[in-house]
Amino acid sequence: GGGFSRYSTDGQWLVPHFEKMLYDNSLLVMAYIKAYGSTGRKMYGCVAEKILEYVRRELTDSQGGFYCGQDADSDGVEGKYYVFTREEIREVLGEKAGRDFCRQYGITGHGNFEGRSIPNLLENDNYEEICEEPWGNGDHGGNICHGSCDTIGGRENEECRRLYQYRIDRARLHKDDKILVSWNSWMICACAMAGAVLGEEQYVDMAVRADAFIKSHLVKEGRLMVRYRDGDAAGEGKLDDYACYSLALLELYRVTFRVDYLKRAAAWAEIMTEQFFDRERGGFYLYAKDGEQLIVRTKETYDGAMPSGNSVAAQVLYRLTRITGDVIWQKVLEKQFCYLAGAMDGYPSGHSYGLLTMMDVLYPAKELVCTLSSGSDTERRRKLAAQLANLAVTAEGLTVVIK
């Protein structure tokens, strides 16, 4: 079915906590896309594509927003949706195909999880080839996996398709169908990066639709809301919402070079700085200054399940400085790093995203400026953007600007 569960519950990485979350899968797409762009290793690109196919199929609202995730339980039993008995496999696939499938994916009579089996490739030496195979479920993946399998691979993917349908018919998982600005922003970044590196417009389209959803449903009176569900947008936007959404718009600019994305990113970053930034000591507060009046306005710097709002804000400020050359952004960025420096020095592993941004600042960066005549048509600009987008995402320390 694609997608990553939250974490492993054992040292063998066999039994997951079966819940799947949008933010985990967003960050993993970006990691795999970076790995693929750096190494050219096919498996990394395939894994990213299969995550995105899972998100498109299971976690995407009809209007383009992304849901939070899927629960671990079905019919009150954790993991029931994902496990099989050997008899079920043979019943669905037939005796011979079922026997071969069980051998391939480690499905046994005694099982590996409460008497049933979690299909896995832990003891299969061909795991990398299998991971590179496209799905045979009628869905169209990207150009990395598509058409790469041989006859055996095609047969196995047909078997996976049949088992996937059987699994859906047997029991469906509950979805957390809230749509959060910050989580959606990370998936927008992931889709945009994947589209640029893999050369697949469909992933950029997913990012564009999600942005349009936020713009239409999660902005009230010029300010961001936190979440949307069943026609209702609620919660005043916090630092994470403004920082992550600004970053998502900058990522869309980086892969499309449409100036409106850059302008909107700068506009949201201005609100973020005005409402959340501590101009005396540096750092961004978690809550806006015109929001609910609290006894203490807190700041958070350490990365948890997702990068901290302060670290993401630093990345936004860095990109705006590089792209626009505006000293206003540079001054705020310098003060931000003065604030973050002590925390990053004292607990480096808890501030990895901030450290990555600091590396961007400290190591010499290059700028590639491409100019088009004022009469250049939209199609010519689009083609140039597509050619440069891969370079903009994969090349470390490079800023690409079209003028």
Regions found by a protein language model. Give the residues of each.
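Glycan-recognition and catalytic cores of secretory/periplasmic carbohydrate-active enzymes
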Residues: G1-K403
